[in-house]
């Protein structure tokens, strides 16, 4: 790889938290970029300590934070606001189960990345490590696609301005960001890829 990971994974501007649904879409895009990097790193033949360290940091910090965002804030709001025809309980139950499995898989990925750094070896040098990272990336992409296709449209439809403002504040507080008033974005096209 010729460029640093930060150049390949977009950072979300703090101001995007003014529209938390658009922020989740952008955050999901970042996670897909992370998965792409992890896939590429899993087959790289050379030892790339900066990349491996960055992947490790993302797994430890960003992934855990994202699960908290959804489990403690977004999902409870959706359960409270969804209509019966939304059939949200089964969907959120499935995603919560996936989050639990994701955290277990992330712990294994973390150990693999730490081992690579400690031994100064590429991920691809060990089939167990390589397959673990590839499987994690594949599962994460599928999970994100389901959230984008089903959860976020329901959130956009059902959450009130007050819900969105509270969600925005909670997401910002978890990141120690001072927030301005939240609301619905009229132009979230840039983050809906």
Predicted features by range, described:
Residues 1-193:
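Small-residue-biased structural context
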């Amino acid at each position: 790889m010729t460029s640093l990971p930060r150049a390949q994974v977009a950072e979300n501007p703090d101001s995007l938290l003014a529209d938390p649904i658009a922020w989740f879409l952008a955050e999901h895009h970042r996670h897909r970029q992370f998965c792409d990097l992890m896939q590429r790193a899993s087959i790289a033949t050379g030892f790339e300590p900066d990349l491996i360290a960055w992947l490790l940091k993302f797994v430890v910090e960003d992934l855990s934070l994202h699960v908290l965002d959804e489990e403690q804030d977004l999902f409870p709001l959706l359960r409270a606001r969804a209509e019966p025809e939304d059939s949200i309980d089964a969907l959120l139950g499935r995603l919560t189960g996936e989050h639990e499995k994701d955290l277990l898989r992330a712990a294994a990925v973390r150990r693999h990345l730490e081992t690579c750094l400690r031994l100064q070896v590429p991920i691809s040098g060990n089939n167990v490590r390589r397959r673990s990272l590839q499987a994690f990336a594949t599962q994460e992409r599928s999970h994100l696609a389901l959230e984008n296709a089903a959860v976020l449209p329901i959130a956009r439809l059902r959450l009130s301005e007050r819900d969105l403002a509270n969600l925005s504040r909670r997401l910002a507080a978890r990141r120690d960001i001072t927030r301005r008033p939240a609301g619905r974005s009229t132009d979230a096209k840039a983050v809906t890829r």
